[in-house]
């Protein structure tokens, strides 16, 4: 069984975000287990020390990292994939690890400390995406790749 953990900074998402995440998570069949870990964003204002906030959020993220998982940071500068390339990549990763952990940063992205810990960096787009929407895009992309691997008609 493939385990997919998604660690994301930010909680208290709007209903439409939770609905989108739940919709794609339930589409995966018994062979894949999806787990979402939400880390609350620290309070920000105009006078906030963003470096200090990022450091604290990084510590919370590190504490949430599952042992023995392949860590994949979602980062604008990461590698991007077509749907077919992502299907091939997932097939290859399943040979390496039975647990993939995707990390979604907050408004400032991920700290260098977290990026350094990760085995890979992936990009979903060259666009700057709101981090709540990234959850849905990631799960849809993974589901599409899964459907390609399994010859499911979703991708067609």
Curated annotation (Swiss-Prot):
Subcellular location: Cytoplasm
MF terms in GO: rRNA (pseudouridine-N3-)-methyltransferase activity
CDD domains in the cross-refs: RlmH-like
Coiled-coil annotated residue ranges, if any: none
Family recorded in the similarity comment: Belongs to the RNA methyltransferase RlmH family.
Subunit structure: Homodimer.
Protein name per UniProt: Ribosomal RNA large subunit methyltransferase H
Organism field: Legionella pneumophila (strain Lens)
Lineage: Bacteria, Pseudomonadati, Pseudomonadota, Gammaproteobacteria, Legionellales
Gene assigned in the entry: rlmH
């Amino acid at each position: 069984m493939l385990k997919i953990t998604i660690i994301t900074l930010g909680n208290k998402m709007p209903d439409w975000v939770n609905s989108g995440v739940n919709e794609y998570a339930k589409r995966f069949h018994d062979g894949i287990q999806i787990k979402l870990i939400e880390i609350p964003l620290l309070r920000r204002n105009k006078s906030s020390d963003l470096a200090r906030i990022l450091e604290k959020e990084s510590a919370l993220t590190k504490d949430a990292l599952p042992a023995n998982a392949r860590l994949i940071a979602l980062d604008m500068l990461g590698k991007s994939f077509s749907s077919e390339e992502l299907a091939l990549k997932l097939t290859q990763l399943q040979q390496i690890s039975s647990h993939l952990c995707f990390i979604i940063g907050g408004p400032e992205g991920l700290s260098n400390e977290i990026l350094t810990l990760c085995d890979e960096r992936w990009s979903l787009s060259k666009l700057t995406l709101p981090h709540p929407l990234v959850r849905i895009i990631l799960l849809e992309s993974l589901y599409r790749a899964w459907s390609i691997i399994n010859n499911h008609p979703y991708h067609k």
